[in-house]
Amino acid sequence: MPKLKTKSSVKKRFSVTATGKIKSTQSAKRHGMTKRSKRSIRVQRGTTVMNQSDSRIIKLFMPYSR
């Protein structure tokens, strides 16, 4: 049986934690930041853990992750 390929777009955008959760950067921070408060800009600087239903889909595209 041939090896399964990992989607390159998923490989660049998401990472898997040691417990198996999917971690990604915050979305909606490319442009239009002048309309937002400083607090919302600061909160979006970090990363977030995806919910269970979305992470199940992402794990299908990364067959060799934990």
UniProtKB/Swiss-Prot annotation:
PROSITE patterns: RIBOSOMAL_L35 (PS00936)
Pfam families the UniProt entry points to: Ribosomal_L35p
UniProt keyword annotation of tRNA processing present: no
Protein keywords: Ribonucleoprotein, Ribosomal protein
GO cellular component: cytosolic large ribosomal subunit
Record keyword Plastid present: no
GO molecular function: structural constituent of ribosome
Signal sequence residues: none
UniProt family annotation: Belongs to the bacterial ribosomal protein bL35 family.
Protein name listed in UniProt: Large ribosomal subunit protein bL35
